Structures are given as C-alpha cells and as structure tokens.
Amino acid sequence: MAFEEINEGGLVFMRSTLIPARHAFTTRYGGVSRGEFESLNLGSNRGDDPEAVRENYRRVCALMGAGIDDCAVTRQVHGNTVRVVTGADRHVCMSTVPYEADGLVTNERGLPIMCFIADCVPALLCDREHSVIAAVHCGWRSSVADILGETVKKMCALGAKPENIHAAMGAAIGRCCFETDDDVPEAVEKYLSGETAGLFDRRADGKTMVDLRAANAVRLRQLGLKAENIDISPECTMCSHEKYWSHRYTKGRRGSQAAAIVLD
C-alpha cells in the first residue's frame, strides 16, 4: 500500500497502488489559473476565471481518458446522499449540477466520477471483480452521517462485495491540524460506536485534534472491508498547503482539487 506522485506533462497527481482502476487525486500543480488560484484549481464558484477553470477541468478529464463533458461530478452539501450515476448524468462543464450528492457510485465503463476537496477527506473505492466504483467527499459532517455506509450499500446493490472493495483516502487535513470543539469527537464517537482508540488528541485548552481519515478507515473495516485493502495518504493538506488546496490555511480563499476514478 502506497501513494505515488505522478507527473504527466506538468500535471501532478497522486495515485494509490492499491486501487485497481484508473484514478487520480489532483494537486495544485499543472493548471493555468493565476494569482491566488495558481495553478490547478477545479472550483468554479470561488472567483477564478471560468476559462481557466474550464481548461484545468479539461486536463483532469483527459487523465481519465474522457472529454470535458463526459464525467459525472458531485454537488456537495456536506450530507450523506450517494447517487448511482449513469451516462445520463454526464456533466456539461461549468453548468449547474442538477442533483445534490456528496458521493457517486457507478458500474458503467468509460464514465469517470469525480468529487472535490480542500481539506475534507477524498475517498475512492473500487471492486474490480464486480466492476463497481465510487468517489466520495467525506467532510466531518458527511462522515458522521455515515456517507461511507451509504456508499458501500449502493455499491453492493450493484453487485460489489465488501471483502472485494479496495479503498484509498487521499490528502486531507490531518490530526496535526484538524482542531475541533467537543461536537466533532462526540459525533465521531457515536459514528463509530465508541471504536475510537487513537483517533483523538485532547489538549489542555479544551480543543481536540481529530484524525478523520483514520476514523473513516475504522468505519470501512466495520463495513466489511479488509484492513489490507484500505490505503491512506500520509499527507496533510494544511501542512502541505503549497501542494494542496487547504480551506483552513487560506481561510476560505482557495481553489479545489479533485479525486476521480473510472472503469476502463
């Protein structure tokens, strides 16, 4: 299990050796945006030049072997809705996504699916044997609302088996930087039915540092995934803010990166 950095023509992305499908966790490198959005910004609602975002998006779609209007994407609301998508859900770039969903599942070949992040946990899942994939935006609210449980349920409805699912979680804000009040660890405790050993660092000032990726790895194991089939990036988006977009570091003045996967 490992993440490797790939550079294709200047576009830098991360890939998990565990995921048996074409996929990418993008970084800030390899786009055309300028100023505070330099350079690979995929957020279309942050104030960046729309034509720059469009070109950035085209480059990421090309990584997935697709055209700019050939992917299905999330419209994220920090909820637990997971949508099963088909070719009818292909998104016309820069248009409004007509549904709300923080996770996407498909069994259609040649249909890339994509979610967007800037500190939240990006999760890509794949059952290669049964040809089912998922892309999930796991912010803390989506996580504790059990979006991964919804994802695995939708994948299994398409024929996937938990023991065959491989999952990778890309760069996200780490326990080193994810400072929270009591509401977050309390919600995580409930989410995981108390299986939270090693997930929190409680500080003297009353704040708690939370390892959200590790928490979601616990949930995936509870859902039947094998521990050896779960990969976790060691990178923190806030610590590595020059490489990744971080909402907390920039206080909201930032772009977005993507996690994308496709069945070839």
Q: Where do the PLM segments sit?
A:
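Active-site microenvironment for binding and transforming phosphate-containing groups
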Residues: 1-264
